Amino acid sequence: MPVDMVDVAGLVPGAHEGLGMGNQFLDDLRQADVLVHVIDVAGSTNDKGEPIEPLTHDPANDIRFLEFEMDMWYLSIINKGWERFARQVQQEKSKISVSIAKQLSGLRVTEVMVEESITKLKLDSENITTWSESDVSRLATELRRQTKPMIIAANKADIPGADKNYERINQQFPN
């Protein structure tokens, strides 16, 4: 099976708001089926990618950072006109999963993914207008997990002490 690998631009805090190369980075991710997130498991680079003393940076923060930026990106797409969208779905008695999948088709979200997410999160599948901001945020996170599964590649694992970070990351991010 052929695989296309693409190295995408760096990410900075606030990328989902368009800061740095954020929009370019997120647009590059739009077509990805899987992400391979290469982290410095030895914690020898800081948030800016600058070399620092090994084991002084928590590589789990790098994982959380990428997940957060992607979750906020998904949420911003869902939230565009959400109230009007939710009312329209209710008034037209449209199937919620079909409507949301259509809105997020550019992210490769399918109707089945939306249905599974709604069920998993125990959201009201009949009345979208009852969903809270937290419900919509949880949906964004779940859809991101389904459409952009992430493999963590532990770089610099040969540096003494990196094995402890590796074990901790495996516990914190089991999937």
Where are these regions (language model features)?
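Short, acidic Gly/Pro/Ser/Thr-rich loop/turn segments
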Residues: G43-S44, W73, I159-P160
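Alpha-helix-centered segments that form part of catalytic cores
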Residues: V114-M150
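Conserved beta-strand segments of the P-loop GTPase G domain that flank and frequently precede/overlap
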Residues: H37-D40, I152-N155
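Non-catalytic, alpha-helical, charged scaffold/linker segments
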Residues: H57-T129
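Canonical P-loop GTPase G-domain recognition
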Residues: I77, R87, T129, P149-I151, ...
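Short hydrophobic alpha-helical runs that function as membrane-insertion/retention elements
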Residues: V36-H37, N175
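Switch II of P-loop NTPase G domains
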Residues: P2-V36, A42-F65, T130-E142
